[in-house]
């Protein structure tokens, strides 16, 4: 309802279906960054899934440091007497991205935090996001070395 009020729209089924893209959503947490894109590709290859919008916050992180791949897709939902399209938000991220986003949300949106302090801590939060991204890349590199059989000597 907040989103409808903010957009000054009536509280009707039509207004919701036409203007609210995240009435339904799912978060997919993957082990590795490359898995995110593989999962997205598999989803979008389904003949009953239509891509409406794609926001790649992995390749283009938010200023806060937030990383995730967001897809708005349209999928069929089956009601008692009909099949209707529904917009669904799909968020795909790694375990590290999910860890950071969960903790950042808890810290940033706590009540009674001084705005000035929060602004100063934002630099630390972005630094943590960057370190988290480095960890993702390092773990993916290790996985690829294992897959190629190059786990010998000083390869690490």
What spans do the regions from the language model cover?
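A structural signal for alpha-helix termini and helix-coil/disorder junctions
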Residues: 6, 45, 109, 141, ...
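Intrinsically disordered, low-complexity acidic/polar and Pro/Ser/Thr-rich regulatory regions
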Residues: 135-156
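Surface-exposed peri-terminal alpha-helical interaction modules
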Residues: 7, 23, 33-36, 74-77, ...
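Short aromatic/hydrophobic contact patches that present stacked aromatics
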Residues: 25-29
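A glycine-rich, hydrophobic loop/mini-helix early in the fold
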Residues: 1-24
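Long beta-strand-rich cores associated with HINT superfamily self-processing modules
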Residues: 17, 30-139
């Amino acid at each position: 309802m907040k989103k409808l009020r903010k957009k000054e729209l009536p509280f009707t089924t039509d207004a919701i279906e036409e203007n609210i893209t995240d009435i339904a959503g799912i978060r997919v947490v993957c082990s590795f960054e490359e898995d995110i894109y593989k999962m997205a590709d598999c989803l979008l290859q389904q003949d009953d899934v239509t891509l409406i919008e794609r926001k790649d916050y992995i390749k283009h992180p938010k200023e806060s440091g937030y990383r995730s791949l967001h897809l708005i897709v349209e999928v069929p939902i089956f009601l008692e007497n009909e099949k209707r399209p529904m917009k669904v938000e799909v968020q795909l991220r790694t375990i590290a991205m999910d860890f950071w986003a969960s903790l950042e949300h808890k810290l940033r949106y706590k009540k009674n935090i001084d705005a000035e302090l929060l602004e100063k801590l934002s630099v630390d939060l972005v630094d943590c996001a960057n370190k988290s991204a480095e960890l993702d890349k390092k773990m993916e590199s290790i996985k690829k070395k294992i897959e190629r059989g190059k786990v010998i000597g000083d390869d690490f």
